[in-house]
Amino acid sequence: MEKTFKFTPEEFRTSVKIIQYLRTAIGSSLENHDEQKVRKYIHQAIVAGHVHRDVFGLNPILTSLQTAQIAVDEIGLHRDGVIATLLYGSVANDDDHEEIDQLFGENVARIVMGLAKIQKLYEKNPVIESENFRNLLLSFAEDMRVILIMIADRVNIMRQIRDVEQEEARHEVSEEASYLYAPLAHKLGLYGLKSELEDLSLKYLEHDAYYMIKEELNATKKSRDAYIQQFIAPIQEKLTEAGLKFHMKGRTKSIHSIWQKMKKQKCGFKGIYDLFAIRIIIDSPYNLEKQLCWQAYS
């Protein structure tokens, strides 16, 4: 007989903190009794035996809360997306669609069922590392929030599996993050999450390469930061003289990006010279965007 699902004390404390955060972050978009109904739905799923720890031993309810926090913080989802994220791990079958619709509305039900449909599509396609499958996912999701939640969930899982013992499962999850979820994040403009997925994938799949590059970047950080500021200064001066309103940012390229350059150029870390990138953001009326961007470029 399977043990009853339970929280560890640490999981419980972490869950309470995230719930308090979500309450503050999206409270204005919640409807009356939303929180109570979510709690009741999940509790019933636990009692019915529908909630189980995953292959890594992670608590699915805590995982859903963490994913919801990422979806709010880094993607900007609100009530419907958050509730769907919290409910999805407790859904037993397709018959739950009507109940979720009645409890939380059509939008939440559509997202939850969209996540279920994508999971079935995922399981039926043994080869998912192709552009065709990524496009199929995008076309198959009737609500784009489904894909956004999937990306947030994979980012969360990648953050949690650093010290797990299930090496084979971690390898598989990391490969999927690299060839499926990172390109999806890039396609949807989630560049920060895309870089994080790529870096974590490299960390788990090419451990030695990841830490070698990380150590080299740390060792050269002071001189590189000084060079970036020296590089930026005359550009800032020229743009200011031109009367442009702008923000300029310099950043070190991701570990994954540097590793790809090393492989492509067949050289070591010291053979890569473009280790940083400069981003200029022009504050402009819509009708003058192209003109002012070309002015800045020239």
Region annotations inferred by a language model:
Residues A25-Y41, H97-N107:
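Short, mixed-charge amphipathic alpha-helical segments
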Residues L86-G114, Q166, L190:
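Hydrophobic or amphipathic alpha-helical targeting/insertion segments
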Residues K117:
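Aromatic/histidine-rich interaction motifs
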Residues L77, G81-V91, I149:
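Active-site alpha-helical segments that house and flank conserved acidic catalytic motifs
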Residues D34, F56-P60, Y88-G89, D101, ...:
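Short secondary-structure transition/capping motifs
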Residues M1-S28, K40-D54, I61-L65, Q69-E74, ...:
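Nucleic-acid processing machinery
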Residues H33, D95, F104-E106, I128, ...:
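Short coil/turn linker and secondary-structure boundary residues
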